[in-house]
């Protein structure tokens, strides 16, 4: 809720809204500084990990910021849908979990 409200908690602003705008968008690309062709970048972007990194948040291929932990801890934020999905489970397939979140839950909103 705090992240969806961009720094407001119980009606009081605790963090600047700009921090969330910046932090939930790509601040760095994983391939920055490399001399890559458009084709090479397109191949890299087939991987969920290569869509940018904000402030402790990965940017997913669909543009949704996400927080990842080890073994199935994931939180995906869809501000345009007013939706936050948090999962804590045991899996070695974080990208499969992300795909399920996207196709089975987020797509319903």
What label would you give each PLM region?
Residues 1, 20-24, 54-56, 102, ...:
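Non-transmembrane alpha-helical segments in soluble domains
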Residues 1-25:
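Active-site-proximal binding-pocket segments
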Residues 1-8, 73-89:
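Active-site-proximal alpha-helical segments within enzyme catalytic domains
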Residues 24-84:
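Active-site Gly/Thr loop motif
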Residues 91-93:
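A short acidic/small-residue loop/turn micro-motif
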Residues 95-109:
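Short, gly/Ser/Thr-rich active-site loops of penicillin-recognizing serine hydrolases
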């Amino acid at each position: 809720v705090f992240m969806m409200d961009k720094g407001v908690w119980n009606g009081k602003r605790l963090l600047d809204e700009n921090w969330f705008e910046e932090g939930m968008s790509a601040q760095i690309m994983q391939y920055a500084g490399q001399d890559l062709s458009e084709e090479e970048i397109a191949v890299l972007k087939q991987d969920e990990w290569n869509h940018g990194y904000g402030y402790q948040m990965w940017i997913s291929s669909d543009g949704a910021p996400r927080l990842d932990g080890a073994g199935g801890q994931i939180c995906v934020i869809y501000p345009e849908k007013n939706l936050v999905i948090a999962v804590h489970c045991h899996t070695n397939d974080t990208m499969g979990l992300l795909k399920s979140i996207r196709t089975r839950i987020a797509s319903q909103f």
